[in-house]
């Protein structure tokens, strides 16, 4: 099979406006009601109240979603100020920068010979195909191009302010970094070194004196938490982005609103599979909190929840 035969259909970004025809889906789910449909309806109700009543609103998600068309939707949710803090993983920066600077991702399939893909120099992320040259090379070039400019301003940076600097230099309305910069929404990435962007920062820092101060990000979250009256979170996926979100909320006696979208299960004791009720025992979610867990693929559920905000 030829490489060009696999790289034909580009992944496009979704916008909130694309979902306008779905805005009444919650009515359908309410009529269905049974089983998981009930939780979708609950999530819609909680999300609306979270946005209306919580002054501190977290959007937490994992990086794999940014390789899909959900990237543009996540950027829209930030740009429309539904959320004012974003917590994610290092790969989010990688995918957002790669796609913002011309790295095209392609529609592929789970069922492919990965040894063959490696020989064709194609990464596979689930059913997304990423040509080698559209990922690491792009990120490396962007970091090497802009870090000298940024370091000329100052050498010590928090992660969220450094990401704003990159967002300022992006000309792509579907970019999460750009949306965060425009709305001055802090993009908190506790695992920033776990990825291509962080590795490239480390490499260039050995030559130009760049210093990353994660404690500045922690001080920001601390100030936001202690000054908030109510907090809520839409948490998509698990891992470090989920835990960092609920961890900090324990210092205000827990989240007031919590919506989990996950495919992980709790039987193995993992953080990713833990439900909001377990977080109550850790003081990370209030006993009185309104919470719900939807067991589903976020690429299906997030558009439905987001569309409900258009009603």
Curated annotation (Swiss-Prot):
**Which of UniProt's keywords are assigned here?**
Hypusine biosynthesis, NAD, Transferase
> Active site annotated at which positions?
284
Q: Which domain of life is it from?
A: Archaea
* Catalysis performed (reactions): [eIF5A protein]-L-lysine + spermidine = [eIF5A protein]-deoxyhypusine + propane-1,3-diamine
Molecular function terms from GO: deoxyhypusine synthase activity
Q: Does the keyword Transferase apply?
A: yes
The entry's cellular-component GO terms read: cytoplasm
The reply on keyword NAD is yes
UniProt-listed Enzyme Commission number(s): 2.5.1.46
Q: Which Gene3D superfamilies match?
A: Deoxyhypusine synthase
Kindly list the cofactors needed. NAD(+)
Q: Note one Pfam family from the annotation.
A: DS
Q: In which pathway does it act?
A: Protein modification; eIF5A hypusination
SUPFAM superfamilies from the xrefs?
Answer: DHS-like NAD/FAD-binding domain
Known function: Catalyzes the NAD-dependent oxidative cleavage of spermidine and the subsequent transfer of the butylamine moiety of spermidine to the epsilon-amino group of a specific lysine residue of the eIF-5A precursor protein to form the intermediate deoxyhypusine residue.
Family that this chain belongs to = Belongs to the deoxyhypusine synthase family.
| Identification of the protein by name | Probable deoxyhypusine synthase
């Amino acid at each position: 099979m030829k490489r060009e035969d696999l790289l034909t259909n580009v992944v496009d970004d979704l916008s909130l406006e694309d979902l306008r025809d779905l805005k009444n889906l919650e009515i359908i789910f309410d009529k269905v009601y049974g089983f998981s449909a009930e939780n979708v309806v609950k999530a819609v109700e909680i999300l609306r109240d979270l946005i209306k009543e919580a002054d501190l609103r977290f959007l937490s998600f994992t990086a794999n979603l940014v390789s899909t068309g959900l990237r543009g939707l996540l950027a829209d949710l930030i740009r429309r100020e539904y959320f004012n803090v974003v917590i994610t993983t290092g790969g989010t920066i990688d995918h957002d920068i790669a796609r913002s600077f011309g790295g095209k991702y392609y529609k592929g399939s789970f069922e492919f010979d990965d040894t063959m893909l490696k020989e064709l120099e194609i990464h596979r992320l689930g059913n997304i195909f990423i040509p080698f040259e559209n990922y690491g090379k792009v990120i490396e070039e962007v970091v090497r191009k802009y870090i000298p400019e940024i370091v000329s301003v100052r050498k010590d940076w928090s992660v969220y302010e450094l990401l704003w600097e990159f967002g300022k230099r992006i000309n792509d309305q579907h970019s999460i970094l750009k949306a965060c910069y425009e709305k001055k929404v802090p993009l908190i990435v506790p695992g920033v070194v776990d990825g291509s962007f962080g590795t490239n920062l480390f490499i260039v820092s050995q030559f130009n004196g760049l210093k990353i101060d994660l404690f500045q990000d922690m001080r920001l979250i601390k100030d936001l938490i202690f000054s908030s009256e109510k907090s809520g979170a839409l948490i998509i996926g698990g891992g470090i982005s989920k835990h960092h979100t609920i961890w900090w909320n324990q210092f205000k006696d827990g989240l007031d609103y919590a919506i989990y979208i996950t495919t992980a299960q709790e039987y193995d004791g993992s953080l990713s599979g833990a439900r909001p009720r377990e977080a109550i025992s850790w003081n990370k979610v209030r006993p009185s909190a309104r919470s719900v867990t939807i067991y589903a693929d976020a690429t299906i559920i997030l558009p439905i929840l987001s569309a409900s905000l258009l009603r």
